[in-house]
Amino acid sequence: MKQFEFGAGLMMSISLMSFSLGNPPLPLTAKTASAAESQTVLPPLLQRELFFGDPEITGAQLSPDGQFLAFQKPLDGVINVWVKGIDEPMEAARPVTADAESPIMIYFWSADGRYILYGQDKGGNENFHIYAVEAKSLGGTSPVTRDLTPVEGITARIYSVPKRTPNHIIIGLNERNPQFHDVYRLDLTTGERTLLIQNDENIALWTTDLDGNVRIGYRQSLEGGHEILAVQKDGLTPVYTCRIEETCVPIRFHKDGQRVYLISNRDGNLIQLKLLNLESQQSQVVEVDPENQVDFGGAVFSQATDELIVTSYVGDRIRIYPQNDKIAADLAFLKQQLPDVDIVLQSLTIDDRFALIGTRSDVNPGSTYLFDRSTQTLEKLYDDRPELPREHLATMQPIRYTARDGLEIPAYLTLPQGVDPVNLPVIVMPHGGPWGRDMWGYRPFTQFLANRGYAVLQPNFRGSTGYGKAFLNAGNNEWGTGAMQ
């Protein structure tokens, strides 16, 4: 990895008081003598709406049977859900929701593909309800949306969408006690709810097996850490615990129904993928970062067999590890067809034949493709922001620098196009969260600043997630002072 020496050609400027975004410090057109003499051409000044406006299309998902494609797109200026037949052009899509006030940010298909389900609150009150709309009834002039949780003052959660009972989902409602969610089975056709578990044990999260049976509870322990509990006939039994400075979270049941996948760093520095046997309470490591650099990033499971097929890690960029030969061949094909981008598997059909593939990069806000795994063919569906000229965007480079106490800090540096990287004004832009690390890729505010002549440094300072337990906890008692500052 290339090392950057900030003193050699890049002047760091921490204070932003002298910066004026309305009056950029660098020339922004090629009509000056200095620009004309430059070896490179300055990019045009791009309007902020191109960076910060709603994407034209985003968030596509295949129906389980592969016959339809849903995605998010503005309707009268508000993000809603649209659906089209898989063989239809994107222009033939019809809206199936018509929220005129708040954008629909999260949605998904029911297990049989009959309904689009989504969560929505009113006016930002954070009382999210679950709504359903007939996804394939596209002939009407106005979609009919049903509130499946019509209770005032509650926040609904969706815990599971089991394939084996496609007309039912498992949800949580805090109707009885605003602090905790009881667990219900919800009939998508009638809206009828059946109580499964009354939450009297301060459980924050419930996990079901692949058949929709509630098997795991997750809560904070009295010592400030967390504990995973098995749901049994006579109550809840702790089966795995971690301390306050550690991580342990269940993510999905194994197809054998006896073991559960979880992520944990209880026995090491990096978060690992593990399998926990609920009966023996013994766990085994499934995978840890092959490069021994970062925490476990994510997992993808087959829709057809429920087997683990892909793992991923976020280092300087996303790294993907196929778990069988067929997936390895698919990934090799995709990398050949889609070079120089990070590849994300967005959704799979129930038979694993079709996959939605998302691509991202520092200069690509997002593109989505339909991949037929049986024929090894790839069809581009859309770009998220087609009007944003990628040739005028600035590249983001992973770098490392050494803090005053010798700790190596990972960061990303974005330099404006068309000028030498010497004596540039620099905006240091720490991530929020406050722990959630920055990643390589398109960032609208970063590109907006770079287009106006600023270099942007995004440090993943000590206390950032993703780089192991030691790096995360190195930020304890250092906020705003000490070595972090």
Task: Name each model-derived stretch.
Residues 46-51, 93-97, 144-150, 192-197, ...:
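A short beta-strand motif characteristic of beta-propeller blades
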Residues 37-57, 90-93, 328-341:
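A short helix->beta-strand "capping" segment at the edge of beta-propeller domains
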Residues 85-89, 135-138, 187-191, 231-234, ...:
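Short loop/turn segments that connect beta-strands within beta-propeller blades
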Residues 49-82, 355-356:
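Beta-strand-rich domains and repeat architectures in extracellular enzymes and scaffolds
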Residues 54, 72-81, 98-103, 115-132, ...:
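A flexible loop/linker signature enriched in serine peptidases of the S9 family
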Residues 8-20:
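Bacterial N-terminal signal peptides
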Residues 60-68, 106-115, 159-168, 206-213, ...:
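Blade-terminus and WD-like Trp-Asp/Gly-His loop motifs, strongest in beta-propeller folds
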Residues 344-485:
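Serine-hydrolase catalytic core recognition
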